[in-house]
């Protein structure tokens, strides 16, 4: 079977249309089936540095689905191929054993304390 690249589109979470984007992700990542891919998410002390990170997966034509919560917790039904981690003001999502159905948009999200009030 021929291997083919999978494109994982990474979208930065914005807290409302009026808010400045505060988390930074690379525009895309790709890999071939079976590979391990890591997606980074960079923030600051007011968001990732002091709050937990969630990750969402949006498959084409569907609503976003919670993939990882509280930095590294998987909801029931999410395969253990997906794992999350956080260190300082950065977080990452790792997908091991990449599969064709993983081709999707991935969002990182964290509350930003500077948006209060």
Curated annotation (Swiss-Prot):
Residues 73-108 are annotated as: Framework-3. Pfam families: V-set. Residues 1-19 form the signal peptide. Disulfide bonds join 41-108. The keyword Transcription does not apply. Residues 70-72 are annotated as: Complementarity-determining-2. Residues 53-69 are annotated as: Framework-2. The modification Pyrrolidone carboxylic acid is found at residue 20. Residues 20-44 are annotated as: Framework-1. Keywords: Adaptive immunity, Cell membrane, Disulfide bond, Immunity, Immunoglobulin, Immunoglobulin domain, Membrane, Pyrrolidone carboxylic acid, Secreted, Signal. One of its GO terms (molecular function) is antigen binding. It is found in: Secreted; Cell membrane. One of its GO terms (biological process) is immune response. InterPro entries: Ig-like_dom, Ig-like_dom_sf, Ig-like_fold, Ig_sub, Ig_V-set, IgV_Light_Chain. Residues 20-117 form the Ig-like domain. Residues 24-45 are annotated as: Disordered. One of its GO terms (cellular component) is immunoglobulin complex. Residues 45-52 are annotated as: Complementarity-determining-1. Residues 109-117 are annotated as: Complementarity-determining-3. Immunoglobulins are composed of two identical heavy chains and two identical light chains; disulfide-linked. V region of the variable domain of immunoglobulin light chains that participates in the antigen recognition. Immunoglobulins, also known as antibodies, are membrane-bound or secreted glycoproteins produced by B lymphocytes. In the recognition phase of humoral immunity, the membrane-bound immunoglobulins serve as receptors which, upon binding of a specific antigen, trigger the clonal expansion and differentiation of B lymphocytes into immunoglobulins-secreting plasma cells. This is Immunoglobulin lambda variable 1-44. It comes from Homo sapiens. The lineage of its organism: Eukaryota, Metazoa, Chordata, Craniata, Vertebrata. The gene is IGLV1-44.
């Amino acid at each position: 079977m021929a291997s083919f690249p999978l494109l994982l589109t990474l979208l930065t979470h914005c807290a409302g249309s009026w808010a400045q984007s505060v988390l930074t992700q690379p525009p895309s990542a790709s890999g071939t089936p079976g590979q391990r891919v890591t997606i980074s998410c960079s923030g600051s002390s007011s968001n990732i540095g002091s709050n937990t990170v969630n990750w969402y997966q949006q498959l084409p034509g569907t609503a976003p689905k919670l993939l990882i919560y509280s930095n590294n917790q998987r909801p029931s039904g999410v395969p253990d191929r997906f794992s999350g981690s956080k260190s300082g003001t950065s977080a990452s999502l790792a997908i091991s054993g990449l599969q064709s159905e993983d081709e999707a948009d991935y969002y990182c999200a964290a509350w930003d304390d500077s948006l209060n009030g």
